[in-house]
């Protein structure tokens, strides 16, 4: 790769799943994975890319199981939102330890813990090359953190949502179950809907489609994949018009 290559994106929204933070433990936060992700985000900041981050909460709390056991869905979703704030606190701390300026914002007010989400403030911070971690989802029950990622991506006028997963991209079938599954390099929004490919939940996906926000699905466990994505190299699956 030529050393003078420039990033293809100026501002990104990175969506990390909570599960991505748990490592092999199956629960909680793996400190070594957290530190590696912080280093990869630091690389982007050093390239001059403005980074917004949305993190899920599935490594700390899963509401679906408790909902089946009779817990009120709204209560479960509120607990899930708090789990994303806990992940956000951990990520902010890891970034600070890597000497990266980061701010944590929450869609629900948590005075003394982090700032409340403000669109204008988030944009201002991004322009000053601060990493902005956007937690507590949309602040509403019944909306996933994928929906939050697309919503915040549209609000902060990100060039793309980068959805970090445990697989290399979007496949014709589940690669864990079907060895013949092949990966798509590029798809349109309508192709994803026609083929019923599981990229995100429908609410999140249609939000991105309606606002022409590109989505790139890639494997965060692959060292250097995030950098390759922002440099415009072949990595993962790109979904656009």
UniProtKB/Swiss-Prot annotation:
Description of how activity is regulated: Allosterically activated by GTP. Competitively inhibited by magnesium-free UTP. Magnesium-bound UTP is unable to inhibit enzyme activity.
Keyword vocabulary terms for this entry: Allosteric enzyme, ATP-binding, Cytoplasm, Kinase, Nucleotide-binding, Pyrimidine biosynthesis, Transferase
Note: The peripheral distribution of PyrH is related most probably to its role in the synthesis of membrane sugar components.
This protein's name: Uridylate kinase
Ranges where the record places region Involved in allosteric activation by GTP: 23-28
Reactions that this protein is recorded to catalyse: UMP + ATP = UDP + ADP
Pathway terms, separated by semicolons: Pyrimidine metabolism; CTP biosynthesis via de novo pathway; UDP from UMP (UMPK route): step 1/1
Residues that bind ATP: 15-18, 58, 62, 92-96, 101-103, 165, 171, 174
Family: Belongs to the UMP kinase family.
Effect of residue 140 to A: Loss of activation by GTP. Moderate loss of sensitivity to UTP inhibition
Protein purpose: Catalyzes the reversible phosphorylation of UMP to UDP, with ATP as the most efficient phosphate donor.
Keyword ATP-binding attributed: yes
Enzyme class, UniProt record, top EC level: transferase
EC number(s) given by UniProt: 2.7.4.22
């Amino acid at each position: 790769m030529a050393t003078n290559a420039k990033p293809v994106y100026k501002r990104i929204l990175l969506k990390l799943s909570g599960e991505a933070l748990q490592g092999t433990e199956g629960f909680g936060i793996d400190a070594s994975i957290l530190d590696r992700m912080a280093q990869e985000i630091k690389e982007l900041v050093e390239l001059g890319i403005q980074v917004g981050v949305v993190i899920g909460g599935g490594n700390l709390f899963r509401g679906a199981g408790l909902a089946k056991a009779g817990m009120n869905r709204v209560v479960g979703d509120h607990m899930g939102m708090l789990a994303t704030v806990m992940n956000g606190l951990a990520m902010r701390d890891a970034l600070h330890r890597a000497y990266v300026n980061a701010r944590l914002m929450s869609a629900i007010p948590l005075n003394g813990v982090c700032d409340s989400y403000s669109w204008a403030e988030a944009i201002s911070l991004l322009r000053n090359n601060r990493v902005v971690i956007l937690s507590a989802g949309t602040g509403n029950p019944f909306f996933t953190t994928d929906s939050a990622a697309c919503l915040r991506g549209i609000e902060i006028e990100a060039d793309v949502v980068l959805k970090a997963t445990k697989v290399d991209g979007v496949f014709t079938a589940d690669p864990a179950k079907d060895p013949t599954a092949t990966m798509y390099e590029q798809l349109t929004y309508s192709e994803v809907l026609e083929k019923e490919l599981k990229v995100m939940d429908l609410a999140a996906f249609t939000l991105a489609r309606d606002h022409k926000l590109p989505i790139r699905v890639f494997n965060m466990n692959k060292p250097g994949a995030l950098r390759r994505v922002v440099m415009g190299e072949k990595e993962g699956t790109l979904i656009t018009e």
